[in-house]
């Protein structure tokens, strides 16, 4: 599948295009890029790589959790492009993205995210189906209750995590790769209906 992936859930936004066996990526300082310029940045990204929207058949969009304005703007643009260009739209959240390479590998997986100085955790089963609601937790609770649980944290998030958490047992640091989203899609693990931002308090 040829696709565009948009992730503006964090301060560093990213765009990714896969066309056949070629991939193209770009990072943007999303907290310093006006949201009304996002559409232009996407079109410039295609143009820089001699591509057009006609080259893709779908869009993957990060629903969060994360930056409120970034999520809202990127989701609105993704929906607009999907409708105007008749492209399939697939939504994903940051919790399952961290687990993309663990399908059928662990009975229980705890995906950890830190957002606005708060820790959040979501449990998945071996089929990567959410076993629980998103739970807000603390450093001490994670250390006390999840030391022996199999946990995943994105490598680029480690700078935000307390060192005590990063030293816990069974902590798996993962790279977030846009191409893994196609794997999630092929296994029916992306949202296709009611795609909306995932906000955390």
What is the predicted role of each segment?
Residues 42, 77-81, 99:
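Buried hydrophobic packing segments
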Residues 1-63:
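N-terminal beta-alpha supersecondary unit
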Residues 20-23, 75-82, 119-120:
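Short, basic/glycine-rich phosphate-binding loops at helix/coil junctions
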Residues 1-18, 90-201:
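Oxyanion-binding and handling regions
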Residues 58-94:
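DPxDG-like acidic metal-binding loop motif
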């Amino acid at each position: 599948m040829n696709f565009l992936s948009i992730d503006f859930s964090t301060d560093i936004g990213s765009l990714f295009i896969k066309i056949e066996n070629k991939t193209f990526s770009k990072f943007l300082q999303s907290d310093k890029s006006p949201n009304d310029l996002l559409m232009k940045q996407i079109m410039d990204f295609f143009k820089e790589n001699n591509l057009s929207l006609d080259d893709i058949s779908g869009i993957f969009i990060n629903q969060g959790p994360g930056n409120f304005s970034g999520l809202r703007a990127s989701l609105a643009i993704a929906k607009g492009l999907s409708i105007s260009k008749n492209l399939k739209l697939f939504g994903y959240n940051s919790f399952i993205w961290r687990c993309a390479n663990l399908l059928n590998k662990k009975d229980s997986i705890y995906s950890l995210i830190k957002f606005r100085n708060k820790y959040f955790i979501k449990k998945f089963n071996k089929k990567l189906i959410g076993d629980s609601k998103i739970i807000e937790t603390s450093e001490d609770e994670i250390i006390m209750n999840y030391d022996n649980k199999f946990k995943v944290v994105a490598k680029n998030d480690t700078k935000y995590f307390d060192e005590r958490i990063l030293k816990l047992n069974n902590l798996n640091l993962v790279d977030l790769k846009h191409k893994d989203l196609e794997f999630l899609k092929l296994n029916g693990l992306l949202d296709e209906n009611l795609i909306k931002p995932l906000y955390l308090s």
